[in-house]
Amino acid sequence: MAKKVTGQVELMIPAQQAAPSPPVGPALGQHGVNIMEFVKSFNAATANMKPGTIVPVVITIYSDRSFTFILKTPPASYLLKEAAGIKTGSGDPKRNKVGKITVNQLREIAEMKLKDLNTEDIEMAMRTIAGTARSMGIEIEGYKG
């Protein structure tokens, strides 16, 4: 018989840096999950990623207090900031541009995010990521999307 799902928790945790402190501890503790078991398995699953990369994770909790989790790709805004080499986006993206990326960097980010987006087409994924870049004040050199 299949286990009954009792909850689902979505968190954004830095790769290889999960710890029982907030936000992980309280979010899982209220569901009765073994927090250290999650921390160890999350850190092991993100071992091949660059430390500190923000990783969205969806944790499904079952009635016997066991859990499974799915790692998603880092947020587009995080990937764009990394590519442009900036700390934050622009407060006024229409007037104040804070960084530039190339079309190749845009395509790379779109290919990475493709499995989490609601499209199969790389061109549409690029348009989606370009919209995020535009709203952050990041210019894309040579892109007419």
Curated annotation (Swiss-Prot):
Keywords: Methylation, Ribonucleoprotein, Ribosomal protein, RNA-binding, rRNA-binding. GO terms for molecular function: large ribosomal subunit rRNA binding; structural constituent of ribosome. GO terms for cellular component: cytosolic large ribosomal subunit. One or more lysine residues are methylated. InterPro entries: Ribosomal_uL11, Ribosomal_uL11_bac-typ, Ribosomal_uL11_C, Ribosomal_uL11_C_sf, Ribosomal_uL11_CS, Ribosomal_uL11_N, Ribosomal_uL11_N_sf. Transmembrane segments: none annotated. Part of the ribosomal stalk of the 50S ribosomal subunit. Interacts with L10 and the large rRNA to form the base of the stalk. L10 forms an elongated spine to which L12 dimers bind in a sequential fashion forming a multimeric L10(L12)X complex. Belongs to the universal ribosomal protein uL11 family. This is Large ribosomal subunit protein uL11. It comes from Sulfurihydrogenibium sp. (strain YO3AOP1).
